[in-house]
Amino acid sequence: MASKSTSTAVWGQLRHLAQQQTRCYSATADSIPASKKKYVPTKGVYPKGFRVSGTIVGVKPGNTTKPDLAFVTSDTPCAAAAVFTKNRFQAAPVTFSRDLLKKKGNSGVNGVIINSGCANAVTGKGGLEDAESMAREADRCLGGDGTIVMSTGVIGQRLPIKRILDNVPAAHSRLGSSHDHWLSCATAICTTDTFPKLMSRSFTLPSSPSVEYRIAGMTKGAGMIHPNMATLLGVIATDAPIAPAVLPSLLKNAVDRSFNSITIDGDTSTNDTVALLANGAAGGKEIASESSPDFAAFRDVLNVFSEDLAKLIVRDGEGATKFVTIRVVESDSEETAKKVASTIARSPLVKTALYGKDANWGRILCATGYALISEPGSAAVAEVSDKIVPEKTNVSFVPTDGTAELKLLVDGEPEQVDEVRAAEILKAEDLEILVRLGTGKAEGTYWTCDFSHEYVTINGDYRT
């Protein structure tokens, strides 16, 4: 057994390694770990009519070098939709922004203002007044009355509101549409993220094949990520013309297949918000009907785009060393498949085994077995007996190099596992866990990461 002094020394080394990962607020370009730089774009194609900025305010005490106030604006009022956390303790900006969109009927929105470093959550009436004052100052600068507000950071502390309000005009003066502007804005919403999460791409629509439309998005999140949703902020902007009436269904459909299909640690935040803005600046026929070919085409674009954005969050999970796809197939329903995938994805025993490169498929099977049981008792077990049948269940590791899957369990019977090959698969940064339930044709997917020593260190030091 290790001595106390030895254990202390080991823990000190782990703390030092975690600090080297630069899990600070709003990672700057020169602090991004080498392994993550490949996920940060060096150029982009950004939607017309949008201007953005990132400004250093010092929301978190001691921050004098990293942007922590993001401003996303449209030159013309937008159609807008948002989805919000389902946590009962909803932060002040969530309450404010939900009410704003309801009042304005998802139209007439000028932009989004976001601070990192303080969540403005569980802050009472004063916190709501702070969110309202952020919107008012942004509106004053923009000459409108429709700014969405988002905040992220430590819960239970009031915003340094005067400092923020004094800097909104500066954020407005810095607005621009270049790649550097977008990257600075994406950096400003980060907390314990190690890299800014920014994407953009172009697309066409059936009714206007000669028109190039563009979509750009930024998101943040590294911990407390679990639907619906979690400390996760996202802003997606497009210059496609989309009617306010159909925008909410487009966003909800995309979020269900992306941001609501990821988990880092199983915790759901008070603040998560994803907003979609459409200003129509590229021209063309407005998407006004859910039955139109343009609606279906944009839905597909948005679904893939949102999924790719969400995956960046998992790749930056606190302490994560692996990106893991959990795919459940041959299920009786999509609901069952998603529930099983979600349960496996958030199991601490599964996640720690993955970090340790341990082919412990018993933990995967265990999580599968209790996934649908909401309460103990024989009645609960009987209720799900036709949805998860041990004799029909198969579990495999699927490598990302295109080689054959490694079967661990076949029709409820354990395979003789090639431990050497299993170790090779588990050494990779990316891998897939495949579960076949054998009860139907539906499937569901979740994305998650492993748990490492660094996760404990980061969250033990979060407020310091």
Swiss-Prot record:
One Pfam family of this chain: ArgJ
Site (Involved in the stabilization of negative charge on the oxyanion by the formation of the oxyanion hole): T152, G153
Descriptive protein name: Arginine biosynthesis bifunctional protein ArgJ, mitochondrial
Active site per database record: T231
Domain of life: Eukaryota
HAMAP family: ArgJ (MF_01106)
Residues the entry annotates as binding substrate: T191, K220, T231, E318, N459, T464
Function recorded in the entry: Catalyzes two activities which are involved in the cyclic version of arginine biosynthesis: the synthesis of acetylglutamate from glutamate and acetyl-CoA, and of ornithine by transacetylation between acetylornithine and glutamate.
EC numbers on record: 2.3.1.35, 2.3.1.1
Site features described as Cleavage, chain residue numbers: A230, T231
UniProt keyword annotations, A-Z: Acyltransferase, Amino-acid biosynthesis, Arginine biosynthesis, Autocatalytic cleavage, Mitochondrion, Multifunctional enzyme, Transferase
GO cellular component: mitochondrial matrix
Source organism of the structure: Pyricularia oryzae (strain 70-15 / ATCC MYA-4617 / FGSC 8958)
Annotated InterPro entries: Arg_biosynth_ArgJ, ArgJ-like_dom_sf, ArgJ_beta_C
Misc note: This protein may be expected to contain an N-terminal transit peptide but none has been predicted.
Classification via PANTHER family: ARGININE BIOSYNTHESIS BIFUNCTIONAL PROTEIN ARGJ (PTHR23100), ARGININE BIOSYNTHESIS BIFUNCTIONAL PROTEIN ARGJ, MITOCHONDRIAL (PTHR23100:SF0)
GO biological process: L-arginine biosynthetic process; ornithine biosynthetic process
Gene3D superfamilies: arginine biosynthesis bifunctional protein suprefamily (3.30.2330.10), ArgJ beta chain, C-terminal domain (3.10.20.340), L-amino peptidase D-ALA esterase/amidase (3.60.70.12)
PTM text: The alpha and beta chains are autoproteolytically processed from a single precursor protein within the mitochondrion.
Compartments where found: Mitochondrion matrix
Gene Ontology MF, one: L-glutamate N-acetyltransferase activity
Keyword Plastid tagged: no
Entry similarity comment: Belongs to the ArgJ family.
Root EC class: transferase
Subunit structure comment from the entry: Heterodimer of an alpha and a beta chain.
Catalytic activity reported: N(2)-acetyl-L-ornithine + L-glutamate = N-acetyl-L-glutamate + L-ornithine; L-glutamate + acetyl-CoA = N-acetyl-L-glutamate + CoA + H(+)
